[in-house]
């Protein structure tokens, strides 16, 4: 919304020259608020009780990543949940925006409006699927998101092309010799059947495009809603924060964060406008297989029982 507002307040040239810096500057407000909240946050009751009882880990990094049972949980959580969550969420937001602007030649302002509307419509479903996972479980809801993404990404993006109104048949790439940046030029066919550079989409079907992005947002909600509860329930409190940080941040920062670059590279190398989707589909497939076989259902786990059980078995419990 901030980017959209900035684009509306500036011309295209102004935004390209200096306007793009405004959202980054405004983000300092959010950083300040987040920092303030973090300073005032208290530890969870269970961790406070464990800390008071002297049951915390002296070396959480060592215990989390060198003790095999804990490392096994980390790896299963990464490949069986977080990696798929990362690419599914990034596809719904960032890759969809790249596809609209770069491949389908939809006006940047219009593209941002489409993405913003889809995200606004999808926001309540993050809570809905989180609550649903409290009733039916986490694992298979997350696996369903992976399966639906694998099966539907190509059809969805084909329909996005139809809705945009540009008959894009291929893309060609050029590389800036100075910076190494890859630029994509989409091509369509003219009346004689010759391939020509595509013009900006003149009359995109905005409601249909919003709906198609909303569907992708639903997939993201299906896996993102339950994953926070799953990660908390998957690790013991004494090393929980350290342990869940690795799969979550690698899943989002690496697997998800590399999606735009890998998607762009695949399209550039192949000329196939759908090739960029192969990467999130493959990662989602890995998560589907690994999660289905190895992920334990944590629904119903009473995380405070960990303290009670440890306290009962402690020689100083009496």
Describe the role of every protein-language-model region.
Residues 222-235:
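Intracellular juxtamembrane helix-capping segments at the cytosolic ends
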């Amino acid at each position: 919304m901030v980017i959209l507002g900035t684009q509306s307040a500036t011309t295209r040239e102004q935004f390209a020259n200096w306007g793009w810096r405004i959202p980054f500057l405004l983000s300092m407000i959010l950083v300040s608020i987040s920092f303030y909240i973090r300073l005032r946050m208290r530890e969870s009751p269970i961790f406070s009780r464990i800390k008071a009882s002297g049951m915390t880990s002296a070396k959480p990094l060592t215990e989390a990543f060198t003790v095999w049972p804990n490392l096994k949980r980390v790896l299963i959580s990464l490949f069986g949940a977080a990696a798929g969550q990362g690419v599914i969420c990034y596809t719904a937001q960032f890759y969809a925006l790249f596809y609209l602007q770069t491949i389908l030649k939809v006006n940047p302002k219009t593209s941002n409006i489409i993405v913003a509307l889809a995200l606004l419509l999808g926001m309540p479903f993050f809570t809905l699927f989180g609550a649903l996972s409290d009733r039916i479980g986490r694992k298979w809801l997350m696996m369903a998101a992976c399966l639906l993404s694998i099966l539907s990404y190509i059809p969805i993006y084909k329909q996005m092309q139809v809705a945009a109104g540009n008959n894009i048949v291929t893309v060609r790439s050029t590389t800036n010799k100075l910076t190494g940046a890859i630029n994509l030029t989409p091509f369509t066919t003219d009346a004689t059947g010759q391939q020509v550079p595509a013009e900006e989409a003149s009359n995109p079907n905005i409601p249909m495009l919003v709906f198609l992005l909303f569907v992708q947002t639903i997939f993201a909600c299906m896996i993102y809603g339950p994953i926070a509860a799953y990660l908390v329930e998957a690790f013991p409190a004494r090393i929980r924060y350290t342990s869940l940080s690795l799969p979550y941040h690698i899943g989002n920062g690496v697997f998800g964060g590399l999606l735009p670059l890998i998607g762009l590279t695949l399209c550039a190398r192949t000329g196939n406008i759908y090739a960029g989707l192969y990467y999130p589909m493959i990662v989602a497939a890995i998560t589907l297989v690994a999660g289905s076989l190895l992920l334990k259902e944590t629904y119903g786990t009473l995380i405070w029982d960990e303290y009670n059980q440890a306290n009962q078995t402690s020689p100083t419990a009496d």
